[in-house]
Amino acid sequence: MDIVKVFGDNLRKFRKARGISQEAFAELCGLHRTYISAVERCRRNISIENIQRIADALGVEAYMLLIEEENDNARG
């Protein structure tokens, strides 16, 4: 399991499920849009503080961003 990829995939999934653009989401988090884009694409590491900011903006518990989906695991 690549935790950075899992986090980025989950961030994108939760953000899109809420119909929020990267730009609008970055504003909600107080982060830059290019940072959100880089995290979603596994190009940037993320601090614990920013994980919490993102979780708060999404309205989810932080740990939910770190859980690999069953169907992703099956693909290997």
Which role does the model predict for each range below?
Residues 31-44:
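Recognition helix of helix-turn-helix/homeodomain-like DNA-binding domains
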Residues 11, 22, 33, 48-51:
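Helix-turn-helix DNA-binding elements, focusing on the entry/boundary residues of the two helices
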Residues 9-28:
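Short basic helix-loop element that most often maps to the first helix and adjoining turn
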Residues 66-76:
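Short, charged recognition helix plus adjacent turn
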Residues 50-64:
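DNA major-groove recognition helix of helix-turn-helix/homeodomain DNA-binding modules
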Residues 11, 25-26, 36-39, 65:
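Conserved hydrophobic/aromatic packing and binding residues within compact polymer-binding modules
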Residues 41, 60, 70:
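Short, conserved catalytic or interaction motifs in soluble domains
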